[in-house]
Regions:
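A glycine-rich, hydrophobic loop/mini-helix early in the fold
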Residues: 86-126
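Residues embedded in well-ordered beta-strands
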Residues: 4, 58-59, 88-90, 101-103, ...
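Acidic, metal-coordinating catalytic segment for phosphate/diphosphate chemistry
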Residues: 54-97
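A short, sequence-level motif marking secondary-structure junctions
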Residues: 42, 74-76, 198
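Charged phosphate-binding loop/patch that engages nucleotide di/tri-phosphates or the phosphate backbone
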Residues: 27-55
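Unchanged
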Residues: 1-26, 124-199
Length: 199
């Protein structure tokens, strides 16, 4: 091995362990004292815990939209604009006149992006090692309290989403491949259990 001085602004362009990228981001943000625990399996980051709270790890995608074998923490994915996966579920209600209504959620103002905006009925990032459908079912349960079965969701398309901007004084680059599902079973809005952090 060797030792060399590297300008701070060039560190992120180097071949680093993913845990080092998280550590460097925290230093850049001038985070106060923190506890960061990392667990690797071979060379792959499997778990990252900051101050006792698990961080979201996402699979990065290759040029074909498939998991590349590389995993990265969510805030770094959005800082770098890395391609990743999400699931979107639209809850649809048929009206008597043949039209349709969509159930929208108004995002919490505390969200890291698009706070206070209306959004898809239920959506979320797909954790590393998981799949679109299982993630869609989990998000529907967590965000709205709807316990759906796999056959209750109908895949209606795949969407490549791109956005580059900023929120809360931070760079935000979103490059995502989303599987879009529709849920059409009857829903009584007053019986839904909303996830405070999301809605």
């Amino acid at each position: 091995g060797t030792l060399e001085w590297v300008p701070k602004n060039e560190i992120d362009s180097l071949n680093l362990w993913e845990g080092d990228r998280i550590f460097h981001r925290l230093l850049d943000e001038e985070a106060p004292f923190f506890s960061l625990k990392l667990r690797y399996q071979d060379d792959l980051l499997k778990e990252a815990v900051l101050d006792g709270k698990p961080l979201e790890l996402l699979d990065l995608l290759d040029e074909n939209g498939e998991p590349s074998g590389q995993v990265r923490e969510r805030t770094l994915v959005h800082l770098n604009g890395d391609w990743h996966r999400t699931s979107h579920v639209w809850v649809v209600r048929r009206r008597g006149d043949g039209g349709h209504d969509l159930l929208l959620q108004k995002r919490s103002r505390e969200k890291d992006s698009f706070g206070g905006c209306y959004d898809i009925s239920s959506a979320g990032h797909i954790p590393a090692g998981q799949y679109y459908l299982e993630s869609a079912l989990r998000e529907l349960k967590e965000e709205l309290g709807i316990a759906a079965e796999p056959e209750d969701l109908r895949l209606v398309g795949v969407h490549d989403g791109r956005y580059e901007g900023g929120f809360h004084g931070r760079i935000f680059k979103n490059h995502e491949k989303s599987h879009v599902f529709v849920y059409e079973k009857p829903v009584e809005i007053e019986k839904l259990k909303l996830q405070k952090e999301e809605v």
